[in-house]
UniProtKB/Swiss-Prot annotation:
It comes from Drosophila melanogaster. This is Transcription initiation factor TFIID subunit 2. Keywords: Nucleus, Phosphoprotein, Transcription, Transcription regulation. One of its GO terms (biological process) is transcription by RNA polymerase II. The keyword Nucleus applies.
Length: 1221
C-alpha cells in the first residue's frame, strides 16, 4: 500500500481578488463546447508574489497573459484524476478516504491551493507591487463537459424546429464547482465584482447574474452579446448561466423579478410564480432589510439534478416544479422550494461562509427563514408537522451513519472537571468516525450534506428558543446591515470580509445583541455530533399525590446518540390544567417527583382546561387514580432528540382526542398501534371523522386504524374499517355505495379521500387476504370515478387508487404444477382483476398522460408487487424500457426503483451491471443521482450477506469509478456511499474469498502433479495423506461469518443461468428451493483438474457417463428428485476422504445401502423389483471387494438414475466432484 501523501504547508492567499471578467464568445450546441476568456484583477499583498494558484478543471488552457503584455508559464495538476486506483490490494474505503481528503486539500482554494499554477516570469516582477492591481488574462475552451455545464439537446429523431426551440444549456455546479466552466478562485470566502459577457445565437437568450446592461448584435447580425454587471461583491460559486430560447415573464407585482421558461410552458409558469412576490415582502418585513440585490431572475430548465439552485440575483429551477392551477399537491412543494431560493439570496449568496465548516450557518438560517414563511403561508399545523418530520429524518440519519458535526474546524472545549461531578469529567464523548472525510465539501456524502442542512435548521430553532425570536432576527439584521454597508465600498477599504459569516463571528454577534455567550451551546450542538435519546416512565403515588418520573438515557453508546446534559421540559396535562416543569438532566438516569396540582375527581369534574386556554368536556371513566391525563416531553421540539414515552393506553387516547398540538397527536397515533382494543378503535375512528383535526393527522389515523383492525381481526364486528366513513363523506345520498362526482374544493377532504382507500387496502382477514368487500369497494371507485365537473385534476387520486390495488395483493399460496409457466389462467380472480385494471390504465396513459405520469408511476410499482408475490413471471424488461433516457424523469425513477428491487430479489449479474452502466453513463444527472440513492437505500447485497452478485469484477468497476470521476463530485460521492453500502469500510469479502480459492487450487494442482509422478494413480494411503493439504487449513483466514451455515432460497427460472465453477448451467424449468448454505464436502479434487484415479480408457469413459447422469439428475424435470446447490466462485471445498471411511467393512456398506434404499423408496414412491435391487447391491459389493480404494464416483457408475438421485438427496455433503464439461 502506498503511503499517504502529505499536503504541503501553504500560507494564506498572497493576494486579494478585486474584479473578474468572464467572456464566453463561442457557445456551440452542435459540438457541446464553449470558447472563452477570463480576466482576473488581483491585488498582491506583497511584491514577492511569484506563484499564483487558481482553480480550473476539465478546461483546455491556451494562454496566460499578465497585464496584456507578459506571457506566463503555467502547469495543471488535478489529483482527482487518479485518487488511489493503484491500491489494487486494499480496495478498502478506510484507505481510500485518506487519499480522497488529500486530493481535495491539494486543490482547496481556502488554503491557497488550486489545479492551475501560474508562474510569474522575471519580466513580470516589476508589475507586482503591493496594493496595485494585476490583471491575469486566461484563454480557454471546454468541450463535451462531464459536469458543471449541461447541454440539453433533443434527439435527432425530432423535427429540426422543435430541436432548436427546446435546446438549452445551463450551469449545474455542485456547491463550489464553478471551476468546471471557467478559471477562478472557487471559494465562498473570496467575493469580488463581476462583468459577464455571453455571445449566443440571435434567437437565444443568455440569463446570468447581475443587472443586464445591454444586448449588442454582432457585425454579421447572426449573434448577439448579453452584457451583465454584478456591482455587489459575490463569490465565484454563486455565478451561473443559462442559455436557450426562453419565454420571458416579468412579475406583475415586482418588476425587478423576471421569470424564464422553455417554449410552450408560459401558462404553467404564470400560475406557478404568482405568489412569489409574497416571499420577498415577507423576508424584507421580517428582517427589516431591503433585498440585497437590484434584480432577481428565475429560470426553469430541464434535466436539473436538484429541484432548485440559488445563485447571486438568480435561481435555476427544475421544469418539474411548474404546474397548472388544477394541481393541488405540487403547489406546496413548488412554493416551498422557490421561497427557500429567495431566502438563500440573503444568506448564502449575499452573505457567504468563511469556510466549508461554516456552511451550516448560511444553510440553516435560510432554512429557518423559509420555515417562517411556510408557517405564514400554510399554517402552524403544517409547519409543526414539517418540523417533526425533519427532526425524525435527522435522527434516522445519525443513528444509521453517525453524528453530524456542523463545524468540524475545531473541536469542542473540554468539559470542566469538578470534585463533585467526577463522572462528567471522566466521561468522554465518543469519537465520530464516518466512512468519508467531513473536512472537505468534495469528499462528504450528498446524504450528509442534506442531513446537515436539516440539522443546521434545528440548531437555529434551538437558538431562537434560548434568546427569543425577536433578538435572533436582530442578529440577522445586524449581519445584513454590516454586509450592505461593506458591499458599497471598494476593495481598498478592506471591509469585504463583513460579507462573510463564520461560527465565531455568529457567536460574537449574538453576544453583541443579547449579552449572552453561546460558546457552550455551540460546543454542544455545533462542534459535537449526535442527538439525545430519552426514555420516560411514570408512576403515580396516591399517598403523596405526586407523579414519579424516571428519565433514562440508555442508548448513549449507540451510533449517533450522545449523552445530554441540560434542561428538559416536561409538560403534564392534569384535571385542573396544563403544567410545565423543567428538569435538569445531569446523568443517564434522572428520577423526579412532581407534585400534582389536581386531585383525582373524575366523577365530579368534566370541564378540563387545556394549554390553549379552551375548556373541553372529557369522559373520565377510563381514568385511574392519577389526576394526570397525559405526559409530554420536550413539547416544543427545542432539542435534537428521540423519545420513547411509556404511558397507559387511555392516556394516549386522551392525548389524541383533546391535545391540540399536531405533533402530540402524531405521537399518540403511533403509540396506539400497540393497543388493539375497542377504545383505541373508537378513538382513531373519531379522529378520522373529526373535521377539527388536521388533515395529516386524520390520514395518519386511517393508516394506524388498519394496523389495529388487523390485530383485532378475530373480534372485529361490522363492516370493514373506514368503509362507512368513506361512504359517509363521499358516497351519494340515495346510493352510498356509489361515489359522488369528484369535488376537491375542500382540500382536507381531498387528502382524506386519497388516504382512506390506500389504508383500507391494507386490511386482512383471518386468512391473511384482503376482504372481498374491500376489493369490490376499490373497483367501484374506479368504476364510478367522474372528474368532468371538478376544477382540479384527479391524477393524484387515481394514482392513490392504483397504489391501493397494490396494497391488496398478498403472496401466492397455491402450488402450481411443476414446469408450467405463469399465465393469466393461473392467476387468482382478484389478481387478474388488478392486472387488468393496471394494464388498462398504463395503456391509457400513453394516449392521455396524467400530470407527471403519476398513474403510470403507481402502475409500475403494482406490477413489481405482482411479480414479487408470484402472480407474474419476474422479468425486468418492462422496467428497462421505462428507465431509458427520454422518458419523463419521475417515470424513469419509478422504473429504476423496480429494477433495483428486482436485482436484489431475482436479478443476475448482468442486471446489476445494467444498473451500474446507467449510473455511470446516463445523460441526465438527475436520473444518475436518483438511481444512486435507490441503490444506496436498497443495496443488492451487503457485506454480511452471501450473494452471487458479490463478485470481484463489480468491486473493480466501482473502485475504478470512485477513483476516475474527477469532475462530478456528487456522483463520485454517491458511488462511495454505494461502495460502503455493499462492502463497508473494510476490504470486500469476495476478494479475500477469491484469493483463498485460487490459493487452494494452486495447492491442489501442485499436489496432483507430485502424486501422479510417484504413484501414477490416485490412491489414498497413510503416506499420501500426509502429502495432501487439508482444505480446512486454507479456510482459517476466511471471515468467521462465512463459515456459518444459513438457509438460502434459490430461484430458478426458464431463462436463468447458474454459474458452477467456470461453467454456466441453463435451467429448463422454474422453481424456488431452500437449501443449507454451508461448505460442500467433496473429494480432494481441484475444480479445474480431472480426477486421475482411473487410467484405463474404459474406466475414464464410464466416469464420464456417470458424471453425465449425475448432471442430468441434478436438473431433472421431476421436482421430487432434485436438490440444487449454489456453487459459486467463493465456494469452499472440504475433503471428505478420510482413511477410516474408505476402509470401512461390508457391514457398514450394507447398513448405509439399506438406509439409502428406505429414503429412496419413500421419496419417489416407485415400485422396484426386489430381485433386481439385490442383484445391484451384490454387484456393487463385489466391485468394492475387488478394489477397496476405488473412488466413490466409479463405485456409483452402475447405479440407476433413481438410486443415484436418492443417494444425492439423502446425503448432499457426500457429493462427488462434478465434471460438467
Amino acid at each position: 500500500m502506498e503511503t499517504q501523501p502529505e499536503v504541503p504547508e501553504v500560507p494564506l492567499r498572497p493576494f486579494k481578488l478585486a474584479h473578474q471578467v468572464v467572456s464566453l464568445t463561442g457557445i456551440s450546441f452542435e459540438r457541446r463546447s464553449i470558447i472563452g476568456v477570463v480576466e482576473l484583477t488581483i491585488v498582491p499583498n506583497s511584491e514577492n508574489l511569484r506563484l499564483i494558484r487558481l482553480n480550473a478543471k476539465q478546461l483546455r488552457i491556451y494562454s496566460v497573459v499578465l497585464n496584456d503584455v507578459c506571457q506566463a508559464d503555467f502547469t495543471y495538476f488535478d489529483p482527482f484524476q487518479n485518487i488511489c486506483y493503484k491500491e489494487h490490494k486494499s480496495r478498502a474505503l478506510e484507505v481510500y478516504s485518506k487519499h480522497h481528503l488529500t486530493a481535495a486539500q491539494y486543490t482547496d482554494p481556502d488554503v491557497n491551493n488550486g489545479e492551475l499554477l501560474i508562474q510569474v516570469p522575471p519580466e513580470g516582477y516589476s508589475m507586482i507591487q503591493e496594493g496595485q492591481g494585476l490583471r491575469i488574462r486566461i484563454e480557454f475552451s471546454l468541450e463535451n463537459p462531464k459536469c458543471g455545464v449541461h447541454f440539453v439537446i433533443p434527439p435527432a429523431s425530432t423535427d429540426e424546429e422543435t430541436q432548436m426551440n427546446s435546446s438549452h444549456m445551463f450551469t449545474n455546479c455542485y456547491e463550489n464547482s464553478s471551476r468546471l466552466w471557467f478559471p477562478c478562485v472557487d471559494s465562498f470566502a473570496d467575493p469580488c465584482t463581476w462583468r459577464l459577457e455571453f455571445t449566443v445565437d440571435k434567437n437565444m437568450t443568455a440569463v446570468s447574474c447581475g443587472e443586464l446592461l445591454e444586448v449588442i448584435m454582432t457585425p454579421d447580425l447572426r449573434k448577439k452579446t448579453f452584457h451583465y454587471s454584478v456591482s455587489t461583491p459575490v463569490c465565484a460559486p454563486n455565478i451561473a448561466l443559462a442559455v436557450g430560447q426562453f419565454e420571458i415573464y416579468v412579475d406583475p407585482h415586482m418588476h425587478e423579478v423576471t421569470h424564464f421558461c422553455l417554449p410552450g410552458l408560459l401558462p404553467l409558469l404564470k400560475n406557478t410564480v404568482r405568489y412569489l412576490h409574497e416571499a420577498f415582502e415577507f423576508y424584507e418585513e421580517t428582517l427589516s432589510t431591503r433585498y440585497p440585490f437590484s434584480c432577481y431572475k428565475q429560470v426553469f430548465v430541464d434535466e436539473l439534478d436538484t429541484d432548485i439552485s440559488a445563485y447571486a440575483t438568480m435561481s435555476i429551477a427544475s421544469v418539474n416544479l411548474l404546474h397548472s392551477i388544477a394541481i393541488i399537491d405540487q403547489t406546496y412543494i413548488s412554493r416551498t422550494f422557490m421561497s427557500r431560493a429567495v431566502a438563500e439570496q440573503f444568506f448564502g449568496c449575499f452573505i457567504t461562509s468563511h469556510h466549508w465548516s461554516d456552511t451550516w450557518l448560511a444553510k440553516g438560517i435560510a432554512e429557518y427563514l423559509c420555515g417562517l414563511y411556510s408557517r405564514k403561508c400554510f399554517g402552524n399545523n403544517e409547519y409543526r408537522a414539517w418540523v417533526q418530520s425533519e427532526l425524525a429524518r435527522v435522527v434516522r440519519y445519525e443513528e444509521q451513519y453517525g453524528g453530524i458535526i456542523l463545524d468540524c474546524s475545531q473541536p469542542p472545549a473540554p468539559l470542566p472537571v469538578s470534585g463533585t461531578n467526577q463522572s462528567a469529567a471522566s466521561s468522554k464523548q465518543q469519537e465520530i468516525v464516518h466512512y468519508f472525510p467531513i473536512k472537505s465539501l468534495h469528499t462528504v456524502s450528498p446524504k450528509y450534506v442534506e442531513a446537515m442542512r436539516r440539522k443546521a435548521h434545528f440548531v437555529i430553532r434551538m437558538l431562537e428558543n434560548r434568546i427569543g425570536q425577536e433578538l435572533l432576527i436582530q442578529v440577522f439584521n445586524k449581519q445584513l446591515a454590516l454586509a450592505s454597508s461593506a458591499a458599497t465600498t471598494k476593495i481598498g477599504a478592506g471591509l469585504w470580509s463583513q460579507l462573510l459569516i463564520s461560527t465565531n463571528i455568529f457567536i460574537k454577534a449574538i453576544f453583541t445583541v443579547t449579552g449572552k455567550d453561546m460558546s457552550v451551546f455551540m460546543d454542544q450542538w455545533v462542534r459535537t455530533g449526535g442527538h439525545a435519546k430519552f426514555s420516560l416512565t411514570s408512576v403515580f403515588n396516591r399517598k403523596r399525590n405526586t407523579i414519579e418520573l424516571e428519565i433514562r438515557q440508555d442508548y448513549v453508546n449507540q451510533r449517533g446518540i450522545r449523552k445530554y446534559n441540560g434542561p428538559l421540559m416536561v409538560q403534564l396535562q392534569e384535571l385542573d390544567g396544563t403544567f410545565k416543569h423543567t428538569l435538569q438532566i445531569e446523568s443517564t438516569l434522572v428520577k423526579s417527583d412532581i407534585t400534582c396540582h389536581s386531585k383525582s375527581r373524575r366523577n365530579k369534574k368534566k370541564k378540563i382546561p387545556l394549554c390553549t386556554g379552551e375548556e373541553v368536556d372529557m369522559d373520565l371513566s377510563a381514568m385511574d387514580d392519577s389526576p394526570v391525563l397525559w405526559i409530554r416531553l420536550d413539547p416544543e421540539m427545542i432539542l435534537l432528540r428521540d423519545l420513547i414515552i411509556e404511558q397507559p393506553d387511555f392516556q394516549w387516547q386522551y392525548q389524541l382526542r383533546h391535545e391540540r398540538d399536531v405533533t402530540a397527536q402524531f405521537q399518540a397515533i403511533q403509540a396506539l398501534q400497540k393497543y388493539p382494543t375497542n377504545a383505541t378503535r373508537l378513538a382513531l375512528t373519531d379522529t378520522i371523522e373529526s373535521e377539527r383535526c388536521f388533515y395529516q393527522v386524520r390520514c395518519e389515523a386511517a393508516h394506524s386504524l388498519t394496523k389495529v383492525a388487523n390485530q383485532m381481526v378475530a373480534s372485529w364486528s361490522g363492516p370493514p374499517a373506514m368503509l362507512n366513513i368513506f361512504r359517509k363523506f363521499f358516497g351519494s345520498f340515495s346510493a352510498p355505495h356509489i361515489i359522488k362526482l369528484n369535488n376537491f374544493s375542500n382540500f382536507q377532504l381531498y387528502f382524506l379521500q386519497k388516504a382512506i382507500p390506500v389504508a383500507m387496502a391494507g386490511l386482512r382477514t383471518s386468512h391473511g387476504i384482503c376482504p372481498p368487500e374491500v376489493m369490490r369497494f376499490l373497483f367501484d371507485l374506479f368504476k364510478y370515478n367522474e372528474n368532468s365537473r371538478n376544477h382540479y385534476t384527479d391524477a393524484y387520486y387515481r394514482a392513490a387508487l392504483v397504489e391501493a390495488l397494490g396494497e391488496t395483493l398478498t403472496p401466492v399460496v397455491s402450488v402450481a404444477i411443476h414446469g408450467t409457466q405463469i399465465t393469466t389462467d393461473s392467476l387468482s380472480t382478484d389478481a387478474k382483476l388488478v392486472l387488468d385494471e393496471v394494464t388498462r390504465l398504463l395503456n391509457m396513459e400513453k394516449h392521455l398522460p396524467s400530470y407527471k405520469y403519476m398513474v403510470s408511476v403507481s402502475c409500475l410499482k403494482v406490477i413489481r408487487k405482482l411479480q414479487k408475490f408470484g402472480h407474474l413471471p419476474s422479468l425486468p424488461h418492462i422496467y428497462r424500457s421505462y428507465a431509458e433516457y427520454g422518458i419523463y424523469l419521475d417515470l424513469r425513477i419509478a422504473a429504476m426503483e423496480c429494477l433495483v428491487d428486482f436485482v436484489k430479489v431475482d436479478g443476475r449479474s448482468e442486471d446489476l451491471e445494467h444498473l451500474i452502466t446507467l449510473l455511470e453513463t446516463d445523460p441526465d444527472p438527475a436520473a444518475r443521482h436518483a438511481l444512486a440513492q435507490l441503490l444506496i437505500d436498497n443495496p443488492p447485497f451487503t457485506r454480511e450477506s452471501r450473494s452471487r452478485l458479490d463478485k470481484p469484477n463489480l468491486v473493480d468497476r466501482l473502485w475504478f469509478s470512485i477513483n476516475r470521476l474527477p469532475y462530478d463530485t456528487k456522483l463520485r460521492c454517491d458511488i462511495v456511499d454505494l461502495y460502503y453500502a455493499l462492502y463497508g469500510t473494510k476490504r470486500p469479502n469476495c476478494l479475500q474469498a477469491g484469493e483463498n480459492q485460487s490459493f487452494y487450487k494452486d495447492l491442489m494442482k501442485d499436489n496432483n502433479s507430485s502424486v501422479g509422478s510417484v504413484t501414477g494413480s490416485f490412491k489414498k494411503t497413510s503416506d499420501s495423506k500426509s502429502h495432501l493439504p487439508t482444505p480446512t487449513n486454507t479456510l482459517d483466514n476466511e471471515p468467521q461469518e462465512r463459515q456459518k451455515p444459513a438457509m438460502v432460497t434459490i430461484k430458478r427460472t426458464a431463462t436463468e443461468a447458474f454459474e458452477v465453477g467456470d461453467e454456466i448451467i441453463k435451467l429448463e424449468r422454474s422453481e424456488e428451493i431452500t437449501v443449507l448454505d454451508e461448505p460442500v464436502n467433496v473429494q480432494a479434487y481441484d475444480s479445474e483438474t480431472k480426477v486421475n484415479a482411473l487410467q484405463a480408457d474404459e474406466e475414464a469413459r464410464d466416469t464420464h457417463q456417470a458424471a453425465k447422469r449425475l448432471k442430468n439428475e441434478m436438473y431433472a424435470e421431476d421436482d421430487n428428485s432434485s436438490t440444487m446447490l449454489d456453487v459459486g466462485d467463493s465456494t469452499r471445498y472440504e475433503s471428505s476422504h478420510e482413511e477410516g471411511k474408505l476402509k470401512s467393512g461390508d457391514g457398514g456398506l450394507k447398513k448405509k445401502k439399506k438406509k439409502e434404499k428406505k429414503k429412496h423408496k419413500h421419496k419417489h414412491k416407485h415400485r422396484h423389483s426386489k430381485d433386481k435391487d439385490k442383484d445391484k447391491d451384490k454387484e456393487r459389493k463385489d466391485k468394492d471387494k475387488r478394489d477397496p480404494h476405488i473412488s466413490r464416483l466409479q463405485a456409483r457408475e452402475t447405479a440407476t438414475p433413481d438410486t443415484l438421485s436418492s443417494e444425492d438427496s439423502s446425503n448432499s455433503n457426500s457429493l462427488p466432484p462434478m465434471n460438467l464439461n
